[in-house]
Amino acid sequence: MPSAEDKLKPGAAVSGRETQRLQTRQRVYAAALAEFKRTGMAAADVRDIAAAAGVARGTFYFHFPTKEHVLAEFERLEEARLVAQLAKSVAQLEARCGPPSSSGPEFLTAALNEVVRLLTAMERRVGKTLFREMLGLHFSPRRPDVLPGADQWAAYPIMTILVEAVGRARERGEVYAGADALHTAQLFMVGLYAMLIASHEYPKAMRAEILDNFMATILRGVQAR
């Protein structure tokens, strides 16, 4: 089903009324994100969001049943952007990596480092507060049904890419033969999100050290011996 963003793209066939509805939805969405950046989602007041968008309070709920639904839409769009970049990067990485060596899992290290790079770049682009709110939604009991549940990590496109990357690393002999690709990818993503949330206010050098140690732990756990 096309998203609201897709329907607003040039060339999309929509009626005048539908265009107006989508434009109103986009104003509400943009106003909500701006307020989330300013105060955090929990403290954001729907009345302030509606006023900033120039609509009635009820109009917010017409388009988004809860504030979490705004964040879910943001996550969906940002993940689509990240997945497109990651898929392109991972496709190039194995070609750049030479044959497996005794020095360690070169391809898998590069692939996981690319995930970290893309996520931290996203954090700089959208701001720490909104980024933290987005990651926190993965662990929230109020997570909207429009997103996969907390126990459905395999349903995320980014997980599909990571599972394939772990599988290719296993075929290259970088990862031990019994390593489960899905569980390895899930452990990495859950741990990475938790680390990024917990360390978002840390000094840059300290955070980099924490992420490096986390990465080393994951890689040591699956490295072929």
Model regions: which residues?
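Amphipathic alpha-helical packing segments from all-alpha helical-bundle domains
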Residues: 83-87, 110, 129-136, 140-172, ...
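Hydrophobic alpha-helical connector segments
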Residues: 73, 87-128, 184-188, 208
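Secondary-structure edge/capping motif, primarily at the C-terminal ends of alpha-helices
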Residues: 89-97, 133-134, 138-141, 195, ...
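Hydrophobic/aromatic residues within well-ordered alpha-helical segments
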Residues: 24, 78, 82, 112-115, ...
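C-terminal peripheral helix-coil segments that are non-catalytic and often amphipathic
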Residues: 1-12, 114-121, 159-172, 186-225
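Helix-turn-helix
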Residues: 27, 35-69, 73, 77
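Generic hydrophobic, amphipathic alpha-helix propensity
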Residues: 20, 24-32, 49, 74-78, ...
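N-terminal intrinsically disordered/low-complexity leader segments
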Residues: 1-23, 94-97
